[in-house]
Swiss-Prot record:
DNA-binding residues: 35-116
Highest taxon of source: Eukaryota
Pfam family, one: Ets
GO MF annotations, alphabetized: DEAD/H-box RNA helicase binding; DNA-binding transcription factor activity, RNA polymerase II-specific; DNA-binding transcription repressor activity, RNA polymerase II-specific; RNA polymerase II transcription regulatory region sequence-specific DNA binding; sequence-specific double-stranded DNA binding
Protein family according to the UniProt entry: Belongs to the ETS family.
Keyword hit for Ubl conjugation: yes
Keywords of this entry: Acetylation, DNA-binding, Isopeptide bond, Nucleus, Phosphoprotein, Repressor, Transcription, Transcription regulation, Ubl conjugation
Protein name per Swiss-Prot or TrEMBL: ETS translocation variant 3
Disordered: annotated segments: 136-222, 336-512
Species for this entry: Homo sapiens
InterPro entries listed in its UniProt record: Ets_dom, ETS_fam, WH-like_DNA-bd_sf, WH_DNA-bd_sf
Amino acid sequence: MKAGCSIVEKPEGGGGYQFPDWAYKTESSPGSRQIQLWHFILELLQKEEFRHVIAWQQGEYGEFVIKDPDEVARLWGRRKCKPQMNYDKLSRALRYYYNKRILHKTKGKRFTYKFNFNKLVMPNYPFINIRSSGVVPQSAPPVPTASSRFHFPPLDTHSPTNDVQPGRFSASSLTASGQESSNGTDRKTELSELEDGSAADWRRGVDPVSSRNAIGGGGIGHQKRKPDIMLPLFARPGMYPDPHSPFAVSPIPGRGGVLNVPISPALSLTPTIFSYSPSPGLSPFTSSSCFSFNPEEMKHYLHSQACSVFNYHLSPRTFPRYPGLMVPPLQCQMHPEESTQFSIKLQPPPVGRKNRERVESSEESAPVTTPTMASIPPRIKVEPASEKDPESLRQSAREKEEHTQEEGTVPSRTIEEEKGTIFARPAAPPIWPSVPISTPSGEPLEVTEDSEDRPGKEPSAPEKKEDALMPPKLRLKRRWNDDPEARELSKSGKFLWNGSGPQGLATAAADA
């Protein structure tokens, strides 16, 4: 041993704590395998010869007072082979434990601290052996052993409901990490779940052949297994729920003796040798915490997943691929022509400003052309009026004239009244009696064709584009102002307004 680095002797008999060999600083490895400070404090609290230095606070659960801070710092420096250790440095180490929720400072009391035994998870504090014959005072709290705080599920995977709260830590978590709270999340167990046989301590991890009847479901026949020291950090949590985990349990039992962890961001340093089975939290498989992995549930899940994909045009979610799993075929009701090839229908992009105006103009011009659709066949392509045959124009004019002569007789209106009625918006379109209007068959009715959904004569391409974007009423007004021939026809009483006399005028007014 080095000079000045004498080690506190391990308690052999009687009471107190029994630490493993790795917890003591050896000469061969001066910088590793150190014992933790809070281990050391608990060790001092268990020894009667240090009652004048540090002791449990009378009447308080888990609270202790440092009576001689300098002596405690000196003892800690001797254990760590640091002669310059003082209470200032030691208190900084204690403040580190505040965030880890191992202990906290008692307010209003100097040099008084309290262990947080309710939330304390001690994976690195094994082999604690509190004996009934020890010299612990009555006011001292019972130091929790790992078996009193956690349950360890048996290896029999056919009884997943025996342990409601499984153990997340085994004795294998002592593998030279030395960090007292690396996996110290807040996990509580109900007092009703603690069996009487849970007093078997962590020596089970060293003696692999020892009886496991002291754990959770003790009546189950157990099989021999490798020592926990040889296993990874955690016990098998694959088939058992964890209430603090955001994921549900995995449906596939893991390999015996090898860790099977759920995919969790909290476990960033887990090895990658396990058979990862993604939990149903990643894929909506079931809502229960434990379920039987039968083909009926698989079939129901695959059916609902495929139907949701087909209905909402979503890309299918990834499904965990298990090597020994036979997936039943889908049974979605699909037409035979759709089963061969499925085409995803995409929504068209929103129309721009020009396309929107064009759609609105076509919607407004559609009701205007409805009275004449019975007599005129629908046109597919918009053509200038100059290219049309004048014979067809004359024939359509005669049909319109015959249609208007069957309506009745009223005196013709003036131009101003007609223009005012066009841009008015009556509550209900009135009934228009028509007048007998005679149109000479020799004159081409370009203005009559003009009042429909396409321009009659288009001198240039920009004007054609402007007319296409223009509402039909404004286009009609502009044609009226620019065409002197139409004015002469109207003054002589021979002008067909909107192709069907006053009836077309009423339709245009109703659409305003």
